[in-house]
Amino acid sequence: ASTMAIYTVVENRSFYRLDRWQDTHKTPSDHRFGSDYVTRLSQTITENHRMEFIKARLKRQPKGAKGSVDSTTRSGYGKCLVDLKWGKNKDRDDLPCSLEVYVYSLTTHEPIYYKRLAGNTNDMVTIRTILTEMKELGLKEDDLSFTTDRGYCSKENMGAFHKMGAPFLMCAKVGQIPVIQCLSTICYDEFGLPVNMEYDKETKLYYRQMDIPYTVQKEDG
């Protein structure tokens, strides 16, 4: 079964159970959007529908919009589906899964891009797929800046963003050597507070910006 999410622009909220939301709000359709109906409805969505949706969402983004890249695995019992056949499930090794990739706006939390990939798709292929499709649909330099979690931190992904000309903010694992070297320069006072970092009153966080040199090699050498 599938679940449909509805995003309300006016209220700036999202609801993960549409059938419950229908109890208190008027919707474009009087039909009850239960899980079975949503499953049948989602099966009618074609690749052309998906591409048209992404194209329309990109046009609605303001210049310099901020988007976040994320993914999740979805388990399934289908044995003939290509996306599920090669999926590696982290919770149950005997249950295959697909990889659901999406980009959403950090301002409105509305979806901008989504795609289902095979469960064994690595992060480098994921990022390249996202950038390639969004570029084909009209994404230009500086149209959208990307934020990723530490799972996407690699030189290959940095090179993909750099080649696209897209600004990006990439989280990194604290165990990586460049991160360890930066953290080792932080000094603390007798109370355990950092003395060579800035403090942001709004977020109540300490921060410090450092330059880390890295090399990006073009595909043509």
Annotate each PLM feature.
Residues 1-221:
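Anion-binding and metal-coordination hotspots
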